[in-house]
């Protein structure tokens, strides 16, 4: 009876450890994502200031979705080709969260201003799973 109890307990412990390991692997499988904007030319500097002078910054909106800015700069060193005049990158836990960030009312307004004041492109890059 004692042996049967020990075997049953060992099997249950193995199932529990296996389930925890599968959950851990599943959690690691989702790669991070990066929301990226490259501005190649600012056509209307005064109009573009409307983005930088907004009362609520993109960092606050990104933070609500678990994201954070990793670059927001005009200090760019070209290695090959013509560099953008401004570069923005924001890291998120997933492509879905990066897309949700781009679909917020805040970003829709920013994108509309950027579309009329700059020559730019924006995209989401899927990163490597950790």
Language-model regions, residue ranges each:
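Short S/T/G/P-rich N-terminal loop/turn motif that feeds into the first structured element of a domain
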Residues: 14-86, 92-99, 126-130
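Bacterial N-terminal signal peptides that target proteins for export
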Residues: 1-11
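Surface-exposed, polar helix/loop patches in the mature regions of secreted/periplasmic/lumenal proteins
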Residues: 90-130
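General structural signal for secondary-structure boundaries
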Residues: 3-4, 43-46, 103
């Amino acid at each position: 009876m004692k042996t049967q109890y020990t075997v049953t307990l060992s099997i249950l412990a193995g199932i529990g450890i296996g389930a925890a390991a599968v959950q851990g692997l599943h959690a690691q499988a989702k790669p991070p994502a990066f929301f990226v904007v490259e501005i190649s030319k600012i056509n209307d500097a005064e109009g573009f200031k409307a983005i930088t002078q907004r009362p609520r910054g993109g960092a606050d909106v990104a933070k609500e979705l678990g994201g954070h800015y990793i670059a927001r700069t005009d200090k760019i060193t070209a290695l090959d080709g013509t560099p953008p005049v401004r570069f923005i990158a924001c890291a998120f836990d997933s492509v879905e969260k990066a897309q949700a960030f781009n679909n917020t009312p805040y970003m829709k307004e920013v994108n509309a201003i950027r579309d009329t004041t700059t020559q730019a492109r924006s995209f989401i890059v899927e990163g490597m799973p950790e």
